[in-house]
């Protein structure tokens, strides 16, 4: 697996990337990137080109990072889904590239105050908890984002859920439950990481 070159990579470091085939036969590329530029970046999009063993392009896909913007030094997971199942067996390699726009810094005023996780008897994996808005402004469209890892610390899943309530006034509390519903991968989960995002704030 290789990572493409280009101007956009001057703004990011790819911390990891991994390919997974889901229970329906679709290829997912999971990964994490860090903003190494000197400014906040928004609308960060991961682009992938897919190749067969002969180096021929068999398709492309893209996906927006889970965080709506990345402060300087901040890390976000991403997911790209290749929807052409007819090419799954031909897949051999891929390249990654990233595009972004200049954004505005988000304070880290969303705090995870409780957290627990568990698998269920049906093969799903749940991550739930509570969030506090420690900022002075209302946080809108609050989202909990969970990245899942296997025994080898490879990223094997990414899922998110809107908090309840999704708009949090100053110093209020919301709850969330994120579900990992790919049963093939959920049985391999060894660890996870969690981020909270909103239009105004991010988590610590």
Q: Where are the predicted features?
A:
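Short, solvent-exposed loop/turn segments enriched in Ser/Thr/Gly
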Residues: 24-30, 121-128
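Asparagine-centered strand-capping/turn motif at beta-strand->loop junctions
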Residues: 33-38, 131-135
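Short acidic/proline- and small/hydrophobic-mixed sequence motifs that coincide with surface turns
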Residues: 40-43, 58, 91, 138-141, ...
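Proline/serine/threonine-rich low-complexity linkers at boundaries of modular beta-sandwich domains
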Residues: 2-11, 101-108
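Intrinsically disordered, low-complexity Pro/Gly/Ser/Thr-rich segments with frequent PxxP/GP/PP motifs
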Residues: 58-86, 157-185
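Short aromatic-acidic-glycine turn motif
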Residues: 50-59, 148-158
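Terminal connector regions
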Residues: 83-124, 181-204
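Hydrophobic beta-strand segments
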Residues: 45-48, 63, 143-146, 161
